[in-house]
């Protein structure tokens, strides 16, 4: 059987497994996922999509608009979130196909095949379709945008990046990475930026006409940054930034400006503390890869107030070897994940060949270090590129040892 048919068959099996996991383990109620449902129902109670005009002052903050409105559409049409879970499970399969195509175009068919193999053996790639988290649609649109741009369809690439931003507001990382990758292709990346600008401006103008606010993506960055550094500053001077969420005299845009001011005011006198937190944020982002393993928890554990408890690194260390099914999968996933990360780091010697992938990871990590807060979920959008680099290193290592 020729290679292309084998790859299609593998991707098909991978997609079917995603659907089987959804059927067998059901919905995973991550806190954010549950929050999206609440926000969607609230907006629909006003017969609108998120954010409803009447809630501009009562909303604590503006969350991931695209993800919430996907829930709203599903609830409005089907009175259920199951259709989205099925769509997300299918998107996982399409995403693998795009990862394969990007890798093939950049690095050749041999590396693409190894990338595909590493990808399907990576446990964290299973189960994402059992929740409403933003990673699945965001990664799909970003990767499809990258692929379109690699193939020379820059305008379409920009449009897809704009769609990704609607689900999670960090598509700019992938746009910047591609601009650096093709730094001399001015016409190409200008078209990419125009496509992106068209989508976000269209969404923004539609919301301005309907709701009186120019909004096209989530506004949680300054809130998270201000709260993170307040929490990790031993002095705890002034009020907690999260207290602003209860101020119903401010719109979510005004709250966002307040959080920005709070953080910048804090930064003036705490530059040392800010710099000291940078390696901690990076460590928190990459040290663990247990989030998606919650899919395999029992229903009883999923219903706990802190669902992640049994899968935390500390709990895993203390429980060994008396593990549950989910904990054994988590252990395997961690070993596999660390193997990917190690081979990715070793691929630095091939950075000239792996420029695009390394640009994505470096820019994304820089954003987390300077403008974000450390969280295990935050490395997920970069894993396809990390896996490509890992595959390239493994392929070259194998050649050298033969």
Feature locations, PLM:
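Loop-to-helix entry region of an early transmembrane alpha helix in multi-pass inner-membrane enzymes
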Residues: 61, 65-73, 77-94, 128, ...
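Specific aromatic-rich, kink-prone transmembrane helix
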Residues: 98-101, 118, 137-154, 161, ...
């Amino acid at each position: 059987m020729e290679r292309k048919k084998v790859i299609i068959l593998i991707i098909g099996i991978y997609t079917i497994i995603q659907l089987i996991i959804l059927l067998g383990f059901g919905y995973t109620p991550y806190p954010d996922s549950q929050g999206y449902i609440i926000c969607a129902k609230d907006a629909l109670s006003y017969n609108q999509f998120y954010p409803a005009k009447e809630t501009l002052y009562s909303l604590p903050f503006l969350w991931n608009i695209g993800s919430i409105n996907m829930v709203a559409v599903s609830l409005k049409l089907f009175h259920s979130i199951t259709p989205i879970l099925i769509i997300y499970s299918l998107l996982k399969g399409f995403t693998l196909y795009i990862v394969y195509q990007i890798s093939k175009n950049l690095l050749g068919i041999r590396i693409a095949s190894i990338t595909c193999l590493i990808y399907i053996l990576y446990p964290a790639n299973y189960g994402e379709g059992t929740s409403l988290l933003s990673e699945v649609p965001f990664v799909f649109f970003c990767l499809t945008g990258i692929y379109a741009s690699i193939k020379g369809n820059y305008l379409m690439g920009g449009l897809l990046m704009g769609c990704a931003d609607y689900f999670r507001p960090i598509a700019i990382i992938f746009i910047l990475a591609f601009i650096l990758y093709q730094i001399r292709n001015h016409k190409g990346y200008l078209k990419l930026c125009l496509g992106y600008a068209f989508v976000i401006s269209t969404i923004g103008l539609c919301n301005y006409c309907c709701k009186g606010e120019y909004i096209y993506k989530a506004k949680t960055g300054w809130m998270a940054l201000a709260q993170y550094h307040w929490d990790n500053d031993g002095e705890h001077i002034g009020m907690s930034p999260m207290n602003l969420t209860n101020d119903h005299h401010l719109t979510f845009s005004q709250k966002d400006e307040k959080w920005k001011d709070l953080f910048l005011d804090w930064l003036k006198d705490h530059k040392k503390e800010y710099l000291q937190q940078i390696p901690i944020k990076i460590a928190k982002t990459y040290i663990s890869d247990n989030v998606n393993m919650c899919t395999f928890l029992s229903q009883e554990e999923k219903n706990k107030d802190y669902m992640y408890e049994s899968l935390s690194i500390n709990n895993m260390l203390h429980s060994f070897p008396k593990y549950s099914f989910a904990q054994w999968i988590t252990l395997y996933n961690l070993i596999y994940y660390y193997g990917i990360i190690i081979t990715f780091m070793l691929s630095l010697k091939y950075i000239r060949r792996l420029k695009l992938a390394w640009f994505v990871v470096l820019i994304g990590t820089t954003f987390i270090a300077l403008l974000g807060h450390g969280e295990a979920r935050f490395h997920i959008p970069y894993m396809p590129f990390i896996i490509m680099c890992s595959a390239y290193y493994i392929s070259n290592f194998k050649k050298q040892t033969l």
